[in-house]
UniProtKB/Swiss-Prot annotation:
Keywords linked to the UniProt accession: Cytoplasm, Isomerase, Rotamase
Locations listed in the record: Cytoplasm
Name of the protein: Serine/threonine-protein phosphatase 2A activator 2
Additional facts recorded: Present with 2430 molecules/cell in log phase SD medium.
Length: 358
């Protein structure tokens, strides 16, 4: 079967939350997080397996595609997402099976078909030109699928799946976010961790659990943030936020991160991040109604048959009007288009008129 979306109602969500599929996937995330405790970004686990190198080559192919589609139309006039992102998306989608086959030749045609859906959906929504934690989730499903098919061995690869593969994925997403001004999907405004990502904070908190000197409150020290931005995921995310939301303090534009900084230890932060991921991503219907079940992520018995809301990368604007689709004022899916902070910052730079003393 092709991967399909099945979560449409609160009853479906209850079945999902109690399912072995969710438990196994959550354990996969936690195992990856546990494997990077005490590791800086560059502290890979040696030797690096052929499978990790193949995944890095796959990401390199995706990165190459980003270079083929420069922003041309309305480059200076719109605060919303750039339409050239759709060309990037289309090229990835056309070539996803070919790219997967080139790096993982042992996979069957059926396995490639399953995995290609998650690879396509890892980079954002073509129609809305946005990105959020649901798209990030698709990338983790891709890694989980490769693990399920025997490509990755967690005893050898888990640390490098975060420190090499996930970090490279994050770098590519930063390119896409800044180049195409991707709009935030699933953002809770200033009450979210980040306009786009969740897992860098989760993995980053686990990295820091054994650090003797850095504390959660350290994110308010800009010198420390800059010093450790390339060494720890959490500080890298704070540095990125400070860069694109430079007109105000972290306390104002990211109050949830500010609240978390008051926690005494990174271990408590890490524990809280797991709980938050389960509650705010894996248990939110506006996000999970877009979740694909597949051969390696089987749908729980009793869940609604496939119908309703389907985002397939087409330009059909009626896809959010099916019966059963849950709308949300948070913008997790079909809400008001929100310009990204990146777009606002870049537009301000373009139209800024310096005073004579600058």
């Amino acid at each position: 079967m092709l991967p399909e979306k099945r979560l449409l109602t609160p009853d479906d969500m209850k079945l999902w939350e109690e399912s072995p599929t969710r438990a196994h996937f959550t354990k996969f995330i936690i195992d990856l997080a546990e494997s990077v405790k005490g590791h800086e970004n560059s502290q890979y686990k040696e030797p690096i397996s052929e499978s990790i190198n193949s995944m890095m080559n796959l990401l390199s192919q995706i990165k190459d595609i980003t270079q083929k589609h420069p922003v041309i139309k309305d480059a200076d006039s719109s605060r919303f997402g750039k339409v050239e992102f759709r060309d990037f998306y289309d090229e990835v989608s056309r070539n996803s099976r070919k790219i997967l086959r080139s790096e993982f030749p042992s996979l069957t045609d059926e396995q490639l078909e399953q995995l290609s859906i998650y690879l396509d959906e890892s980079w954002g929504n073509k129609r809305r030109i946005d990105y959020g934690s649901g798209h990030e989730l698709n990338f983790m499903c891709l890694l989980y699928g490769l693990y399920s098919y025997g490509i990755f061995n967690l005893s050898n690869d888990s640390t490098n799946l975060v420190l090499k593969v996930f970090i490279e994925y994050l770098k590519i997403m930063r390119i896409l976010e800044t180049k195409y001004w991707l709009e935030p999907a699933g953002s809770h405004g200033v009450w979210g961790l980040d306009d786009y990502h969740f897992l860098p904070f989760l993995f980053g908190a686990f990295q820091l659990t054994t650090h003797k000197h850095l504390k959660p409150i350290s994110i308010h020290n800009n010198e420390l943030v800059e010093m450790f931005a390339h060494r720890y995921l959490y500080f890298g995310c704070i540095a990125f936020i400070n860069k694109v939301k430079s007109s105000a303090s972290l306390r104002w534009h990211s109050p949830m991160l500010d609240d978390i900084s008051g926690v005494k230890t990174w271990s408590k932060v890490a524990e809280g991040m797991i709980k938050m991921y389960k509650a705010e991503v894996l248990s939110k219907l506006p996000i999970m109604q877009h979740f694909y079940f597949s051969e390696f992520l089987p749908c729980p018995d009793g869940v609604s048959p496939p119908r309703g809301h389907i985002h397939d990368g087409t330009d059909k604007d009626d896809e959010c009007n099916f019966e059963g689709h849950v709308h949300t004022t948070w913008g997790d899916c079909c809400g008001i288009k929100l310009p990204s902070a990146i777009a606002a910052t870049e537009m301000n730079k373009k139209h800024h008129k310096p005073i004579p003393f600058d």
